[in-house]
Amino acid sequence: MKNRVITISREFGSGGRTIGKKVAKQLGIPCYDAEIIQEMVKETGFTPEYVKEAGEYTPGSFLSSAFSNRLFGPTNEDILWEHQYKVITELAQKGPCVIVGRCADYILQDKADCLKVFIHADMDFRARRIVEVYGEREQSPEERLRDKDKRRAAYHRFYTDMKWGYAQNYHLTLNSGVLGIDQCVKIIASLY
């Protein structure tokens, strides 16, 4: 069988991570999500927390510009991007898999056997879900959703020059709030 890769990009709270894991389980292939962060930690020596958070900040943002300046060379975020690119490319070359987030849709854009999926849902569905799944209590769920989506979009735009969530950048976009998690899994698995 030819290697097949499914990338899952998603709005925060839409269930994309859960969908990716369920698709992988149903197909009997690995799902890479936190494993990408772990591999980047091994390669760079940065802490897991830093690697995870840096994936949501673009160089030149307030936080990163306080610590580095691109005029003097690549930022830590740039270094992490290079490692992320390498790790995702290597995972896709290993064999069939599902890769969740981390701009994998862009990184693997030239891979002919890659299905690029975007999962989204309306604000109410996502707000309820982050309270149920993550126990969100510190700020309003809607505020956290807007913040996370804004960061993901900026990061994606900075490194890929593509508009995150824009339907034309994906083979398939699914509304998990309307279809439900399990139906999204069935649809994606049927296209494998």
Where would I find each of the regions flagged by the language model?
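Pre-Walker A (Motif I) flank of P-loop NTPase domains
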Residues: 2-11, 95
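Glycine-rich phosphate-binding P-loop
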Residues: 8-24
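Short beta-strand-centered segment that lines the nucleotide-binding/catalytic pocket of NTP-utilizing
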Residues: 30-41
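ATP-dependent small-molecule kinase phosphotransfer cores
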Residues: 41-96
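Small-molecule kinase domains that catalyze NTP-dependent phosphoryl transfer to phosphate-bearing small molecules
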Residues: 59-66, 78, 137-182
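RNA pseudouridine synthases
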Residues: 91, 104-110
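Conserved phosphate-donor/acceptor-positioning beta-strand/loop module used by diverse small-molecule
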Residues: 110-132, 138-148
